[in-house]
Amino acid sequence: MARKPDISAVPVESAACQGPDPRRWWGLVVILAAQLLVVLDGTVVNIALPSVQRDLGMSDTSRQWVITAYTLAFGGLLLLGGRVADAFGRRRIFAVGILGFGLASLLGGAAPDPGTLFLARALQGVFAAALAPAALALINTLFTEPGERGKAFGVYGAVSGGGAAVGLLAGGLLTEYLDWRWCLYVNAPVALLALLGCRLLPRDRRTGRAVRLDLPGTLLGCGGLVAIVYAFAEAESGWGDPLVVRLLVLGVLMLVAFALVERRVQDPLLPPGVVAHRVRGGSFLVVGLPQIGLFGLFLFLTYYLQGILDYSPVLTGVAFLPLGLGIAVGSSLIAARLLPRTRPRTLIVGALLAAAAGMALLTRLEPDTPQVYLTHLLPAQILIGLGIGCMMMPAMHTATARVAPHEAGAAAAVVNSAQQVGGALGVALLNTVSTGATAAYLADHGTSPAATVDGTVHGYTVAIAFAVGVLLLTAVLAWVLIDSRTEAADETGSASVTPARPR
């Protein structure tokens, strides 16, 4: 007998227009402003992190929480955010998300200590998880004509894709010419303008369907992920440390309980059928696992460029542009043309191998490598960017193919959650690998200034080598799980479902 979910509510939907809303394009501007905040804050603090660490006195072990707190809260609550928007109204939750995001940004900018900053970043992630799915749903409501809706989603995708690059540049400019705190303060005026613009969005109206919020599933799923990430962050003291072992066991048990709960509740947060399918489950892994290396790479290269090569924050942001450009070109130009002619598995595996080759090039970094940007960093970023970009489109295609219409939103949300959660796990794990390798190097070679620099770079390269292994493992999983026979069945069985809003 199915157990009753925790909370049910009469859902509130945005009122559909009788004809095209004359203010729809202005409404899209409001939505895009909010989405830019969400995407930009995933990278804007990266460039400022060395300055943040010095100013607030963070340890090398704890610095990763500036990134992880945001991505973990965002990814872990994204599925719930869609349900909350359904229950209480998309425009209302969108406005609450913007307001909360702006206030959390002010709190982070004024943070007097690391703990306050970590809390603010987590709150940013919570409110981002509320407004992001509401934004997608509002675009569906605003644009009823298929042609206009396609254009709107195209612009939305461009902002989502370009926001990361904008964040890197903005982080460099704000840190160098103002202060790292402005990387967070800058969100407040944008959030205020978007909040005032909410009146341009469709009003919410009630419907007769009941929407149930799976709070036990949310608590178990997010709690399990937090425990595992915390264990990774504390593993510098050794994987056999009692605290680390307890956290890992707790995290695994909570995730097992989450899986059991999702099989029993009437309206699960994550429908088991979405992830039980072999190709879809493999695709979610393919989307999430590479983020371990990608997010870690942002962290280590930022410190390498500023701390070892003495790049300014602005120059650091510019130095990252080839990576973002490679992802955009790989996804929108190369993969878009190859996917109709190439099996997704073939394209995914080839792209992952290219990204692994680029990452492997970075394992040869040294403190005094001549012309290191031209000989190592630039070609590596191009390979990684093109590889990740060419991998994402076919992986998203197979992740959402043949999904039941009522589960399409959940499948799309899992794709987004996998990226954020993979990044959170990656930053925590690779930061621990790096600091552990550095500590071991210094124990063997002493702590002279030269040895400290060498040990720091050694830690980066060991962590990057670990990321290479993750990419190769992902390629193997893609080859095994996304098999040609199942792909053929998917392609002939039904058309793929376009990723919908998270539910």
Swiss-Prot record:
InterPro entries (UniProt xref): MFS (IPR011701), MFS_dom (IPR020846), MFS_trans_sf (IPR036259), Sugar_transporter_CS (IPR005829)
The entry's keywords: Antibiotic biosynthesis, Antibiotic resistance, Cell membrane, Membrane, Transmembrane, Transmembrane helix, Transport
Signal peptide annotation: none
Presence of the UniProt keyword Transport in the record: yes
Gene3D superfamilies assigned: MFS general substrate transporter like domains, Multidrug resistance protein D
Sequence ranges on the Extracellular membrane side: 46-64, 114-122, 174-181, 234-241, 302-313, 368-371, 444-461
Main localization (coarse): membrane
Organism domain of life: Bacteria
Membrane-spanning intervals of the chain: 25-45, 65-85, 93-113, 123-143, 153-173, 182-202, 213-233, 242-262, 281-301, 314-334, 347-367, 372-392, 423-443, 462-482
Membrane topology category: Multi-pass membrane protein
Single GO MF descriptor: transmembrane transporter activity
GO BP terms: antibiotic biosynthetic process; response to antibiotic
Localisation: Cell membrane
PANTHER family: BLR6921 PROTEIN, MAJOR FACILITATOR SUPERFAMILY MULTIDRUG TRANSPORTER MFSC
Protein known as: Puromycin resistance protein pur8
Taxonomic placement: Bacteria, Bacillati, Actinomycetota, Actinomycetes, Kitasatosporales
